Amino acid sequence: SGSCSLKTCWLQLADFRKVGDHLKEKYDSAAAMRINRKGKLELVNSRFNTPTVEDLVYTDQSPDYCLRNESTGSMGTLGRLCNKTSEGMDGCELMCCGRGYDQFKTVQVERCHCKF
């Protein structure tokens, strides 16, 4: 005749797109660091704020993904197809790294499997 209550708590991941956008934002604002003579990390540019525990930091520059680099496994972007009208990652301006690009049109003929 006694009563009891039950509470359940759980954690749930945010939407995958939101997680990706958040990580990209952190990546884009990561702080460049170097190791000083005492073996401690310090900012490369002291004009920026000291990073918090929530910020990303790096000591090495990212490779140039526009160029082929066998040591990193990057194939570069030379010869890849791009979308002239896109402003995203697949857009020609970004993907071609300012080198310019060739334009061409293709006609694609496919069977439509239509039924009448």
Curated annotation (Swiss-Prot):
PTM note: Palmitoleoylation is required for efficient binding to frizzled receptors. Depalmitoleoylation leads to Wnt signaling pathway inhibition.
Keyword presence, Lipoprotein: yes
UniProt cross-references to SMART domains, sorted A to Z: WNT1
Cellular location(s): Secreted, Extracellular space, Extracellular matrix
Pfam families documented for this protein: wnt
Glycosylated residues, chain numbering: 69, 83
Keywords: Developmental protein, Disulfide bond, Extracellular matrix, Glycoprotein, Lipoprotein, Secreted, Wnt signaling pathway
Gene Ontology CC entries for this record: extracellular space
This protein's record includes keyword Cell membrane: no
Gene3D superfamilies the record matches: 3.30.2460.20
Domain of life: Eukaryota
Major localisation: secreted
Any one biological process term the GO annotation gives: muscle cell differentiation
Disulfide bonds: 82-97
Covalent lipidation (O-palmitoleoyl serine), chain numbering: 1
Function as written in the Swiss-Prot or TrEMBL entry: Ligand for members of the frizzled family of seven transmembrane receptors. Probable developmental protein. May be a signaling molecule which affects the development of discrete regions of tissues. Is likely to signal over only few cell diameters.
Protein name as annotated: Protein Wnt-5b
Annotated source species: Plethodon jordani
